[in-house]
């Protein structure tokens, strides 16, 4: 996908905010803990290759990604610190990971056996992290016998270096800690079965550190908080108060490319879902669902100059229209998303409008949008 650098529309990423969020996370670690910055999904839409060096400078000890290709992107960006892939990869790719010093997760004995054949053929050793499903219902070992079999298989097996063992919490951002406590108990039980001792045991995620969940963890996998967003922000939920302030890093700006007056009874957009009840001023913004600004944003208010104006008519593939209170000139700035968390068009408010979470909104902004990095 071509990035539209010649279009008046861009995501602005505040590097000073990224640095400060990283430093704050680092400062709140317990003695001996390491900070692994989660930059999967293009750093939650913010730009992984550009931000990883900034996080590294601010104190990151390593990085987490979702897939091997994301890890390879970081290596191409000259990142030399540890990289852990969190999602399962084909065993056939184990040699590629090993050759690039990228660690992979393991969830089955069958995968280990397949990977060993690949590694033996290439004469490589792979760093692995044993994934435990302690209650997420996703990847990882959950049955004692399966885990014991893997433990036995790894005894003296030099095709693998057991670098880590980890789990992921389903509800660390919840005020009700009962399921969180259950997962901790389950993980500790699985840990007790392991005689091949990993270098790192890690369970803490963004929510665990922000909300002071007291769990022994060698690594904190810090994700959404890096970008200044509170993980306790599901639609209609009560936000938990984080242990330190977060500074949102993303804003989304464009401008009016066209302004016209329409008369009473005139329709706007596909299906004419907006019909002018009187003579109205309509402005066009060059952003659409092909950029991740989806059709459900119809009715959401964006800031045109100093005024919040509703989106009228259906969002088109490449453009959307807003109802203006009066005639304003083409070229007037339009702020689709504000970095101010209290603004009506913050990422959180946008997520509320879409009945989703701000993770999803940020991640859906794709590579057609230019990303401009400010405050270096």
From Swiss-Prot:
Belongs to the alanine racemase family. The lineage of its organism: Bacteria, Bacillati, Bacillota, Bacilli, Lactobacillales. Its EC number is 5.1.1.1. Pathway: Amino-acid biosynthesis; D-alanine biosynthesis; D-alanine from L-alanine: step 1/1. Pfam families: Ala_racemase_C (PF00842), Ala_racemase_N (PF01168). It comes from Lactobacillus delbrueckii subsp. bulgaricus (strain ATCC BAA-365 / Lb-18). Catalyzes the interconversion of L-alanine and D-alanine. May also act on other amino acids. Gene3D superfamilies: Alanine racemase (3.20.20.10), Lyase, Ornithine Decarboxylase, Chain A, domain 1 (2.40.37.10). GO terms for molecular function: alanine racemase activity; pyridoxal phosphate binding. The active site is at 40 (proton acceptor), 270 (proton acceptor). Substrate binds at residues 138, 317. GO terms for biological process: D-alanine biosynthetic process; peptidoglycan biosynthetic process. NCBIfam families: alr. InterPro entries: Ala_racemase (IPR000821), Ala_racemase/Decarboxylase_C (IPR009006), Ala_racemase_C (IPR011079), Ala_racemase_N (IPR001608), Ala_racemase_pyridoxalP-BS (IPR020622), PLP-binding_barrel (IPR029066). Its cofactor is pyridoxal 5'-phosphate. The gene is alr. One of its GO terms (cellular component) is cytosol. This is Alanine racemase. It is an enzyme of class 5 (isomerase). It comes from the Bacteria. The modification N6-(pyridoxal phosphate)lysine is found at residue 40. It catalyses: L-alanine = D-alanine.
């Amino acid at each position: 996908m071509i990035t539209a650098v010649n279009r008046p529309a861009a995501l602005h990423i505040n590097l000073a905010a990224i640095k400060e969020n990283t430093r704050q996370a680092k400062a709140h670690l317990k003695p001996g803990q390491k900070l692994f910055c989660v930059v999967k999904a293009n750093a939650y839409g913010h730009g992984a290759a550009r931000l990883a060096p900034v996080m590294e400078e601010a104190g990151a000890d390593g990085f987490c990604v979702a897939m091997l290709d994301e890890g390879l992107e970081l290596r191409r960006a000259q990142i030399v610190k540890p990289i852990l892939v969190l999602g399962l990869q084909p065993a056939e790719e184990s040699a590629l990971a090993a050759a690039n010093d990228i660690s992979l997760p393991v969830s089955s004995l069958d995968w280990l056996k397949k990977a060993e054949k690949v590694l033996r053929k290439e004469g490589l050793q792979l760093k692995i992290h044993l994934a435990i499903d302690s209650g997420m219902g996703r990847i990882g070992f959950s049955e004692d016998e399966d885990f014991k079999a893997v433990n036995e298989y790894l005894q003296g097996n030099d095709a693998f270096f057991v670098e880590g063992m980890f789990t992921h919490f389903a509800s660390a951002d919840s005020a009700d800690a009962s399921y969180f406590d259950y997962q901790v108990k389950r993980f500790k039980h699985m840990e007790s079965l392991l005689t091949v001792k990993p270098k790192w045991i890690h369970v803490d995620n963004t929510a665990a550190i922000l909300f002071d969940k007291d769990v022994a963890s060698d690594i904190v996998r810090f994700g959404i908080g890096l970008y200044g967003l509170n993980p306790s922000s599901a639609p209609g939920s009560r936000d938990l108060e984080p242990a330190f302030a977060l500074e949102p890093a993303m804003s989304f700006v464009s401008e009016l490319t066209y302004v016209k007056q329409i008369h009473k009874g005139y329709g706007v957009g596909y299906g004419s879902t907006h019909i002018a009840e009187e003579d109205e001023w309509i402005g066009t913004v060059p952003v659409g669902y092909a950029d991740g600004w989806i059709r459900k944003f119809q009715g959401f208010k964006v800031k045109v100059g100093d005024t919040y104006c509703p989106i009228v008519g259906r969002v088109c593939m490449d453009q959307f229209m807003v109802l203006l209170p009066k005639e304003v000139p083409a070229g007037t700035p339009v702020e689709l998303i504000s970095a101010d968390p209290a603004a009506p068009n913050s990422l959180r408010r946008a997520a509320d409008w879409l009945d989703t979470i701000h993770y999803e909104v940020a991640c859906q902004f794709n590579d057609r949008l230019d990303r401009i990095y400010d405050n270096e």
